[in-house]
Curated annotation (Swiss-Prot):
It holds the Pfam family Lactamase_B. Its EC number is 3.1.2.6. Binds 2 Zn(2+) ions per subunit. Thiolesterase that catalyzes the hydrolysis of S-D-lactoyl-glutathione to form glutathione and D-lactic acid. Monomer. This is Hydroxyacylglutathione hydrolase. It comes from Yersinia pseudotuberculosis serotype O:1b (strain IP 31758). Belongs to the metallo-beta-lactamase superfamily. Glyoxalase II family. Zn(2+) 1 binds at residues 53, 55, 110, 127. Pathway: Secondary metabolite metabolism; methylglyoxal degradation; (R)-lactate from methylglyoxal: step 2/2. It catalyses: an S-(2-hydroxyacyl)glutathione + H2O = a 2-hydroxy carboxylate + glutathione + H(+).
């Protein structure tokens, strides 16, 4: 399989996953022009569009892509029905597209209907789990978002996180501010600074490594809890998540 990240807007990624026959899926096309250019350059033949949620920077290119490819199915959660989705999918559903199997995982939090698509080893998780971070809670509750990222964290170690924004460096700066002595975070921040200075993507990233450097996946870490002022055992790890998310929102 050939995985391509297509830059869009200021920091979005539209994902394209193609097989050897150059049949491909397009994930979260916020705009059409860079997708059409990539399709033409690589002579890819789109088989489906996958939408994770309803925000315009993820669905804005659907109408024009369907103008160019009228028969292409557009999969998405119920909240994308008015944003171009032609096939509504739900938690636990399975899809087979161009010989590749996809499992739908409900991950509410950023939006109430947000979903992820998992096709081993690829995880297209939209704005739920970022490298070294997680999405803002724009519609859902902290309980929902924490449960969602924990659900994704249970996937196999080799899972490749294909999220929709290049937020890695800013997320690592926050993580380093919380855990300045953490060598994994400090070293990775330096690596990503070099990568981004060359305008290269920091994604995808393996889930096994993400568990080390993503503070939102380390809410049970006692040292982290102390660093954010939680000195006694918390009532629930959601409270740790809430404190981290609040601090990140104002970072």
């Amino acid at each position: 399989m050939n995985l391509i990240s297509i830059p869009a807007f200021q920091d979005n990624y539209i994902w394209l996953l193609a097989n050897r026959q150059k049949h491909c899926v397009i994930v979260d096309p916020g705009e059409s022009a860079p997708v059409l250019a990539t399709l033409a350059q690589g002579q890819y033949v789109p088989q489906a569009i996958l939408l994770t949620h309803h925000h315009n920077d993820h669905v804005g290119g659907v109408a024009d892509l369907r103008h160019h490819f009228p028969d292409i199915p557009v999969y998405g959660p119920q909240e994308t029905a008015k944003k171009g989705a032609t096939v509504i999918v739900n938690d636990g559903d399975s899809l087979t597209i161009a010989g590749q199997n996809y499992t739908i995982i409900a991950v509410p939090g950023h939006t109430l209907g947000h979903i992820a698509y998992y096709s081993s080893p690829y995880l297209f998780c939209g704005d739920t789990l970022f490298s070294a971070g997680c999405g803002r809670l724009l519609e859902g509750t902290p309980e929902q978002m924490y449960a969602s990222i924990q659900r994704l964290a249970q996937l196999p170690d080799e899972t490749l996180i294909c999220c929709a924004h290049e937020y890695t460096l800013s997320n690592l700066k926050f993580a380093h501010a919380i855990l300045p002595a953490d060598q994994d975070i400090a070293t990775y921040q330096q690596q990503i600074e070099q990568l981004r200075s060359k305008n290269l993507p920091s994604l995808p990233v393996k889930l096994q490594f993400e568990r080390k450097i993503n503070v939102f996946l380390r809410c049970n870490d006692i040292d982290l809890q102390r660093k954010i002022g939680i000195t006694s055992p918390p009532d629930s790890l959601v409270s740790v998540f809430c404190e981290l998310r609040s601090r990140k929102d104002s970072f």
